[in-house]
């Protein structure tokens, strides 16, 4: 059994270089919600040195709200914004001897693309037109994952160690009770359920089936590094190999 571990980096949280020793995929902020050219360059350089897959982490242009405020924009604006951010990170990656391997939207863009076909199609179209070999990271069972596959892109279904789920498989919004899970033992147990049994218990008690191919370890919490070490050790202790999506066997991608 195999799984990818990913983290959102380049967001000014201070533990990026150390986290890159523990994850297999890095989603690097492209400057629109956090980070900037120097942070992008640092993260890319470290990822290249450590052999971690480089991913773009585009967002709405919303640094005031860390990209977490939902926006209603025309598809053309979303398309252009994603292209702009992919181009910026790709240029830096090329200069540092690396290349982008995947794209994972950030914050509100991620959540809206997960449920809104128009937004999903706009993001997917930008990725496909930029480089159809790029993989797409999206919420497991989401509209976004379906749109990516319909467009012929490789889609990697993502689950979250520290987030609550609703019965329909969507994440509990951050402003609602049950959205965030703080207890590390609970997070580890839930992650093992998602990876080994492909299910997670929703806040209402229901079991939700999902295809966990990559686990997000948020890099912006105060204990992010300690938890990343614990979750990787827990996975390896039960025989799960931690590898980047490009190394996943066919049965793990199904």
Curated annotation (Swiss-Prot):
The keyword ATP-binding applies. GO terms for biological process: carbohydrate metabolic process. GO terms for molecular function: 5-oxoprolinase (ATP-hydrolyzing) activity; ATP binding. SUPFAM superfamilies: Glycoside hydrolase/deacetylase (SSF88713). The keyword Hydrolase applies. Its EC number is 3.5.2.9. InterPro entries: Glyco_hydro/deAcase_b/a-brl, LamB/YcsF/PxpA-like. It catalyses: 5-oxo-L-proline + ATP + 2 H2O = L-glutamate + ADP + phosphate + H(+). Gene3D superfamilies: Glycoside hydrolase/deacetylase. Keywords: ATP-binding, Hydrolase, Nucleotide-binding. Forms a complex composed of PxpA, PxpB and PxpC. Belongs to the LamB/PxpA family. Catalyzes the cleavage of 5-oxoproline to form L-glutamate coupled to the hydrolysis of ATP to ADP and inorganic phosphate. HAMAP family: PxpA (MF_00691). This is 5-oxoprolinase subunit A. It comes from Burkholderia lata (strain ATCC 17760 / DSM 23089 / LMG 22485 / NCIMB 9086 / R18194 / 383).
